[in-house]
């Protein structure tokens, strides 16, 4: 497994991955729907899969002395690493913003503020993306477009739901909004809830992806 992960890191990581990490700084843009930031992490996974397909990675990897089910698992684990970096950067920069700016400048009129709860929301959207994209992709690894479009649609529906909650539910509009200094425990609970959803959804994604890939004729 470690050899497959090294292969993914050296041969399949697309350069845009590192560019998209910088998009976590969008938390400093006022009145922006910050949950959209995490779409770029999903887009990174798409570009990596496209790059691997165009370079004949599947034929190469299939010829290696590795378990067939480890092939999708390695790709998903590397994607999880990229997504966790994006989540961590967004959380860190959100904390910097929370500490550096006055409270009135931390309220986001377009969605949730850049705080711990945002990390939980982002994790939940990425978990939903993983659960849809990878099992569909590993049914037919040569076809990437439709799985990505469906997964991106689900992710944006969840983003839309979070934006709706921001304006309709006091928990989101009052308790979970604003900087980390206010209602810290509630925001931390929201973050850990989102991370738990991410872990569960991604675990299911691994299971279904490995099951589907077993049936693929290499």
Task: Name every feature range the model reports, one short phrase each.
Residues 60-62:
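Juxtamembrane/interface alpha-helical elements of multi-pass membrane proteins
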Residues 1-58, 74-218:
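Hydrophobic alpha-helical transmembrane segments of membrane proteins
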